Every structure is written in structure tokens, then in C-alpha cells.
Regions:
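N-terminal lobe/hinge region of extracytoplasmic solute-binding protein
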Residues: 92-154, 185, 266
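Alpha-helical secondary-structure segments
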Residues: 90-95, 176-183, 212-218, 222, ...
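Extracellular/periplasmic solute-recognition and catalytic clefts
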Residues: 187, 194, 206-209, 274-284, ...
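Aromatic- and charge-enriched surface segment that lines or borders ligand/interaction sites
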Residues: 148-193, 210, 216, 316-319, ...
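Surface-exposed binding/hinge segments that line
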Residues: 84-86, 162, 199-250, 606, ...
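Ligand-site clamp/hinge motif
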Residues: 164, 259, 289-341, 480, ...
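Detector for C-terminal structural segments
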Residues: 29, 95, 275-281, 285, ...
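Gly/Pro-rich hinge or "lid" segments in bacterial periplasmic/extracellular proteins
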Residues: 117-118, 123-126, 134-141, 235-299, ...
Length: 639
């Protein structure tokens, strides 16, 4: 499959000639272009942000439209002149795999607090936006940036924060505590319509300013993890502080944060946006960046960041082969290995397969609405779980690149808790594929098979409509076949992420999705199963990944106590609560975890070295994460 799949990419390239020109393809020597990528001429009209529902966890609920509108707007003629930058000083990247497009959208809207606007995770996080703190999730090390330090009080409901002195916005105005307070107040005032606004309104009582560099965040209740999760995890917590002196004069819900003549969008990062079109976003390095002026750190070596759209992983694979792409979407394992065979400059986080990729703290999960008929029965949910062959999905869909999981715990620091739960995991043995036990569960629940071999009760079949977004499509046909073999009337249906997300939030479908959260501790994932994140039938659920609508007062009480605790595998009470949560999850099986996401994140060393990997894990490698800004600063020109 693999070499053929790469060859098939050529069939797709003709419609994307403009894109190929943008990244500097050359018929004479495609691997060594010397000119900066060409830039298309600007157009005239602005495009509004696409409507979307609030998404309190960016990774878990992608509100993307994979088909760009026909009418795209480019930068007005008043935009800054774009200088020439050679290819070997330009870092070329694309969006993540949920951003497969032939053209960028929202090209004149950089209000990253509005749902549906994804610039903050696909481009702005690479160089324009800086966050208070980052975390190297490989070892848990905190990396202070525009924030210098923070400290909780003894009751864990107040955080004193110190900002770094000398930080400036790209227009030269100092970055201060007033910007932070303004941002927090703005987001809460616009709850629930802004990203993260529900979580902030629920947890943040107030922000008090001491002076320009000191402020305090007061919480409504103790939560020792809230600050770092919101302002310093380096994951998908895209909580960009906005410039008060600009935003206080605007309506935050309609402000597009874009005016080339005024230098908008402002950022404190080492790069500024100089052009935005349907074909490319261009960010050029600011040699007057505050980090150099204050002696904090050196300028990053890339002089330009070029963000281009790409149609799918076939096209991305061909661009990687031609050295026209430095990083961007992950490739399927086979596609990556075929591409690497043709270009030895390509690498991933791990130096060898089959698990080339790094963990992203998320699992693939089959979500069933626990309020719907059939799925409201724990025996039915367990029967479906026993029908799933996780090893087969891992091996056939992902060639062993996505390891099976049975508990809502992924990688990084949280894995230290798994040995403390192993006896419970062994007791339930949820990862076993056993059709006989599956059938026994269904019979216990009062079901019998009809003449076609499907499970029925009261004359009604158990129908499972497996709606799966495009980036998870490889597992669809396999899972469909497994469930059918177990007597469930299952149908795989590939759909658009935004449409599936809407239906999932309303509880209208069964979905294979992703659940994220378990980066540091069990609580960060189990909290999704709190009843407060559910909703009555027919209403939209409140939690980012609570599509299962699981409600259990026992689980609620456990999670309420864990919320106010500092996690530690050495804290006997915390460990006991985590074990109780794991036991309830495995007993009730509210959703079915299938495999751990370990994407083959591609890094091209032809023009740039210094990428993170197992040999130097200074940052997690995922392009959509805030921490990718640290990678931009670590890259070195290869030639």
C-alpha cells in the first residue's frame, strides 16, 4: 500500500499547482530551491469567522470545515511589503490533520477567542503568540516565558503571578498585568460564547492587580492544577493574552483583530504577520523583539514562517519528499515510511518504528450516549466493549503505530499511576476481545438474535451508527466489521468534524472521537465523567468530551474531592480516589477507549535541524500545541 499511496499523490497534485508554487517547487532541483516562496497578489473582501459552538477543549472538539469556501479574501493592498527571504531561512509548515484544506479560511480574522477560528493552534502559536509559561510534557519541567513565576496560597484557591520585566507588544507598548486582567474579564463576560469561557466563569472569581508585573487570580474553590492547565501546560490550552490598549476599544465578539496598517494582530512573539491570503500566511521575524532587547534569549534562526494549506496526507507526503515542507500534518505510518525511503532527511519523534510517533495525551474512544435506549444498559456497553478487537484495529488500521488502551489514561506523567491501578485493570480485563462473553452480556440484558443474526429486544435491533471524522477513518471499516460479527447492526459513516461534533453534543449519534486530558494525573481525564458535564436528553452537553452523558453521584463525589488536591503517587488518599474512579469507569464502561494517539509527526532535517526527539526531548513535538514556540527557537539552519 505504502509506495502506491505515495505515487497516487501525483494524481492529486495538478489541482494544487498554486500551492506547489508557494512552497518553491523547482523542476530542476526540487530539494534545493534558493528563492523565497512566491506570494499571490491580494484580493479585496474579508471573510467572517465561521459559526461554531464553544469548545472548551481545543483538541477534543475540532470545529473545522475541511472544504474552504470558494470566495476567499486576501490581504488588502495596504499590507506591509513582503521582503525576499531565501528558502533555507524559511520554515514552511501546514496545519494539523484536522485542517486539510486547499485554501485557508478566516484570512482576515485573527480573533482566536472565537470558536471556529483556529489560527492560534495552526500558526500563531509558532511565532506570534507567547504564553505565560510552557511545560515540557516529556519530563514535567516548567519553562517560564513572559511569566516569571507563580505561587498558590495554602488553601489552593488563589495564585500570585509575577510577569517578566521588559516584555513588549509588537507595537512597543509594554505587556503588563492589566492585559491579563482585561483578557480574563473579557472572556468571562462573554461566557459561554468564547473559547474556555465556561471553565473560566466557573472557576475564576476575580483578578487583582498589584502593579504592572504582579497580579493575583482568585478562584471560586480550591484547584491546584487550574492555573498551570490554563496558562502554562504548553498543550492545547490556547489562552492567548490580548493587548488591552487595542481590545478595550472593540466589541470582543465581533472584533476581527486584523489591520495590516496598524500591525494587527499584535503579539509579544518574535514574529509578526506580514501577509494573510487564502494561499499563505507569512510571519516574518522581528529583530527588535523584546527577548533580544532584554537579553532573555537570542533571536530564533528562521527569518520567516510560512503557513500553507494542504489537501490531505498524500499531498503532504509528496511535499515532504520534495523538501517543500518542513513540518505540519502527521502521516499514516505506511505513508511516512514510504516517504522516508525516498527522502532520508525525514524523521519523527522516535528513531524507529512501528511506534514512530509521540503520544499526544489523547485516546481514540467510541462514545455512546448513555441516555439512549440500549446504551443506557451497562451490559450492552460492556458487550460492545468485548466485541472490539483493539489489537486488530492497532495493527490493521495503524500498522502497530497506535497502541491499544482500555483505560482513559494516555502518556506523559500520568503513566506513573498505572502500576498503582494494575490490579483493578486486571480484575476487569476490559481489553479482552471475547465474542462469547459479549453474547452472554447481551443475553443477561434480555436480548436475543433475530433471523439475520442481530441483537434485538422488544422487536428493536441495536443499531450503531459509527460516525468518524476523516482523520480517524482507517479504523472505521474495521470497527464496523467487528461489531457486525458480534451481532450489532453497525454502519461506518465518515463525516465532517464540525457536523459530527454538533451531533455528538446533542447526543444524536455514536461517534469515534478523541478524549484528551490525562497529561499529568488521572483526575484530568476522569473529570470528564462528572455529571455536571452531562445534559438532559435533547440538550447540548456542557463538557468538551462528555458525549457519553454518564451520570453517577459516586463518581461525582470522588472527583469533587480530587479537584482540590495536589496530585501525587505518594499521596495515599489521592491514589485511593484515583483507584475508585478507575474502578467505577471499568465497572460502568461509559465510553470505550480503543487506542492511544501516537501520530507520526514529520520533521524534515533538509533545511532545519534541532527538532525534539527521544534523543533530545526538550519539548513535545506536536505542531498545534503552545509549546511548539520553543521548537521554533531551537531550530538551526542545516545549510
Amino acid at each position: 500500500m505504502n509506495p502506491l499511496k505515495i505515487r497516487k499523490a501525483f494524481l492529486f497534485l495538478l489541482p494544487f499547482v498554486v500551492m506547489a508554487i508557494l512552497v518553491g517547487c523547482s523542476s530542476d532541483d526540487p530539494a534545493e530551491p534558493t528563492e523565497a516562496p512566491a506570494v499571490s497578489e491580494p484580493a479585496k473582501e474579508a471573510e467572517p469567522v465561521k459559526e461554531a459552538k464553544e469548545d472548551d477543549h481545543d483538541h477534543a472538539d475540532h470545529d473545522e470545515d475541511d472544504h474552504a469556501d470558494d470566495d476567499h479574501a486576501d490581504v488588502p493592498a495596504s499590507a506591509k511589503e513582503v521582503k525576499d527571504v531565501p528558502r533555507n531561512r524559511t520554515l514552511v509548515f501546514t496545519g494539523w490533520s484536522d485542517y486539510y484544506k486547499t485554501q485557508h479560511d478566516n484570512v482576515e480574522n485573527f480573533n482566536s477567542w472565537l470558536p471556529g477560528n483556529q489560527h492560534s493552534r495552526h500558526a500563531m502559536n509558532k511565532g506570534l503568540t507567547e504564553y505565560l509559561f510552557y511545560t515540557n510534557l516529556n519530563n514535567g519541567e516548567l519553562v517560564p516565558w513572559i511569566g516569571e513565576s507563580f505561587e498558590y496560597n495554602d488553601t489552593m484557591d488563589s495564585i500570585d503571578v509575577v510577569l517578566r520585566d521588559g516584555v513588549e507588544w509588537s507595537d512597543g507598548v509594554p505587556f503588563t498585568a492589566h492585559d491579563v486582567k482585561f483578557t480574563v474579564d473579557m472572556v468571562i463576560a462573554n461566557s459561554p460564547d468564547m473559547n474556555r469561557s465556561s471553565a473560566w466563569a466557573d472557576m475564576i472569581k476575580s483578578v487583582e492587580i498589584t502593579d504592572d508585573l504582579h497580579f493575583t487570580i482568585n478562584l471560586n474553590r480550591p484547584d491546584p492544577r487550574f492555573f498551570i492547565n490554563q496558562f502554562g501546560l504548553g498543550h492545547e490550552n490556547h489562552t492567548a493574552i490580548v493587548a488591552k490598549h487595542v481590545w478595550e476599544n472593540e466589541d470582543a465578539m465581533t472584533f476581527n483583530n486584523y489591520d495590516p496598517e496598524k500591525g494587527w494582530p499584535l503579539g509579544t512573539g518574535a514574529y509578526e504577520l506580514v501577509r494573510s491570503t487564502a494561499e499563505a500566511q507569512i510571519y516574518d521575524r522581528r529583530d527588535d523583539w523584546w527577548g533580544v532587547e532584554t537579553g532573555f534569549t537570542d533571536l530564533p534562526e528562521p527569518e520567516r514562517l510560512l503557513f500553507i494549506p494542504v489537501a490531505d496526507d498524500d499531498v503532504a507526503g509528496q511535499l515532504y519528499i520534495a523538501n517543500d515542507l518542513d513540518y505540519g500534518p502527521p502521516l499514516l505510518k505506511g505513508t511516512f515510511e514510504a516517504a522516508k525511503a525516498r527522502n532520508d532527511s525525514l524523521r519523527s519523534f522516535n528513531s524507529e518504528g512501528p511506534e514512530w510517533g509521540a503520544a499526544d495525551g489523547c485516546n481514540f474512544v467510541l462514545i455512546m450516549n448513555n441516555q439512549k435506549k440500549h446504551f443506557d444498559n451497562v451490559d450492552v456497553r460492556w458487550a460492545i466493549n468485548l466485541a472490539v478487537n483493539r489489537d486488530e484495529i492497532s495493527n490493521l488500521a495503524y500498522e502497530g503505530g497506535m497502541p491499544p488502551v482500555e483505560l482513559p489514561i494516555s502518556s506523559y506523567g500520568v503513566k506513573q499511576y498505572l502500576p498503582l491501578m494494575q490490579d483493578i485493570i486486571d480484575k476487569y480485563d476490559a481489553g479482552t476481545h471475547d465474542l462469547a462473553k459479549s453474547a452472554a452480556r447481551m443475553e443477561t440484558a434480555g436480548y436475543s438474535k433475530d433471523s439475520a443474526g442481530y441483537w434485538t429486544k422488544d422487536g428493536e435491533k441495536v443499531v450503531i451508527t459509527l460516525e468518524i471524522p476523516s482523520w480517524m477513518r482507517p479504523q472505521g471499516p474495521i470497527l464496523e466489521k467487528q461489531l457486525q460479527a458480534a451481532g450489532f447492526d453497525a454502519v461506518f459513516k465518515q463525516g465532517e468534524p464540525a457536523t459530527i461534533g454538533d451531533r455528538l453534543q446533542m447526543g444524536e449519534t455514536e461517534v469515534v472521537w478523541v478524549q484528551c486530558g490525562s497529561i499529568n494525573e488521572p483526575y484530568d481525564t476522569f473529570k470528564s465523567y462528572h455529571s455536571k458535564n452531562s445534559a438532559p436528553p435533547g440538550e447540548t452537553y456542557k463538557g468538551a468530551v462528555q458525549g457519553g452523558r454518564y451520570e453517577n453521584p459516586e463518581m461525582d463525589a470522588i472527583l469533587d474531592e480530587m479537584e482540590g488536591m495536589i496530585h501525587s503517587p505518594n499521596d495515599a488518599r489521592y491514589v485511593e480516589l484515583a483507584r475508585q474512579a478507575a474502578e467505577l469507569y471499568l465497572r460502568d464502561m461509559p465510553v470505550i477507549h480503543i487506542a492511544e494517539e501516537k501520530h507520526v509527526v514529520v520533521q524534515n532535517e533538509h533545511y532545519w535541524t534541532g527538532w525534539p526527539g527521544v534523543e533530545d526531548p526538550y519539548a513535545a513535538p506536536y505542531p498545534p500545541w503552545n509549546g511548539h514556540y520553543l521548537i521554533t527557537h531551537n531550530l538551526k539552519a542545516a545549510k
